[in-house]
Amino acid sequence: MALYEHVFLARQDASPQQVEELTAQMTGIVEGLGGKVTKTENWGVRSLTYRMNKNRKAHFVLLNIDAPSAAIAEIERQERISEDVIRYLSVRVEELEEGPSAMMRKADRDRERDDRGGGFRGEREGGFRGDREGGFRGGDRDGGGFRGDRGPRRPREEAETATDGE
C-alpha cells in the first residue's frame, strides 16, 4: 500500500466537533477500504493567504495515511461533495514523518515564546523613540532644500485666511 499525507481545510464557522466528525468520517473511509490512518493532527483555525469560497480562515487537519489509491480517491470524492471542506490536498510520500509535523513544531515554538512573559514593557525613560529623538520630524526628506526644476516653495497661507470664507 502507498503512503500519503492528506490535508484538508474546513470552513471557519464549522465547530470543532464538526471538524472531528469530518476527520472520523475520512478515517472510516480509509479503514473501510483496507487502509489505516497512522496520524491525525488538527492544526486549529488559521488565517488563509487569500479568500477561498468567501472564507478568510479555516480549520486545518493533517492525516497520515497508509492505504490503496482507491481509498484516497474516495476521500477526495467525499470532500468534493461536502460543503464543510474548502480545499484538500493528497500527496504521495516515500515515508511518513514520525513525531509532530513541522506545523505542530512551529506552534510549540510560538507557545514557548509566549511563555517568556515579554508583554508590555512600560514607558521608556525620556520618551526615547529610537533614531527619531531630537532629529528631523517629518516633512520633506531633504528638509525643504533644493527642489531641482520645480522652483522654490510658495509660503503657506495662514489659518486665518482659510477661515475667512465662512
UniProtKB/Swiss-Prot annotation:
One GO process term, biological-process aspect: translation
Region (Disordered): 97-166
Biased composition (Basic and acidic residues): 105-159
GO cellular component terms, semicolon-separated: cytosolic small ribosomal subunit
Matching InterPro entries: Ribosomal_bS6, Ribosomal_bS6_sf, Ribosomal_S6_plastid/chlpt, Transl_elong_EF1B/ribsomal_bS6
Record's keyword annotation contains Lyase: no
Protein name per UniProt: Small ribosomal subunit protein bS6
Lineage: superkingdom: Bacteria
Any Pfam family hit: Ribosomal_S6
Family under the similarity heading: Belongs to the bacterial ribosomal protein bS6 family.
Molecular function terms, GO-annotated: small ribosomal subunit rRNA binding; structural constituent of ribosome
Protein purpose: Binds together with bS18 to 16S ribosomal RNA.
Protein species of origin: Bradyrhizobium diazoefficiens (strain JCM 10833 / BCRC 13528 / IAM 13628 / NBRC 14792 / USDA 110)
